[in-house]
Amino acid sequence: MLDRADAVRKKTTDDKDLDKLDQCCGEAYFARALAYSELVKLFCKAYESDEDAAGQLGVILSQHYLGDETMRRASLKDSYQFILDDLDRAAELLELEEDFNTDTQGTLYDSIYFNEYTVHALRARVLLYMKRWDEAIKYATKVIDSGYYYLSSCTQAATSSASYYKYMWTNDFS
């Protein structure tokens, strides 16, 4: 899909269509990074260091899905680099306009679309898995300081008489 979308982007001249394509491509890169990050987390050893990760098995990486090439597992280091590269592309394509205004365009907190701050949040998580603490703090701080998102408090009332925590446990009917 990403290969086809890039080909369409090169042939499109209408700015409105280009914006839509950029959003779709950015979301696809983000979704692929998210999927690969979950695969790495579930099926690979923990990332200890760059030297160690270069010798550990990662996941099968593919940027295109055509042909009958032999699929081999990449190193853990290459797997994480693939995820970070996808996040770089996604951040570039999903960058918010400088004049984005939550008063007129709505909040990002309940948005159904990915944006540059969801990319920063995932990057912070991936960097935590890679034990790159300072970089993880940098990207998490970008999300927190953006003012577009807020943390929920377990003492904040979900109803007039219960905290989220109490509400969750007393009203779970599954």
Stretches found by the model and what they are:
Residues 1-30, 37-174:
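Structured, solvent-exposed acidic/aromatic patches
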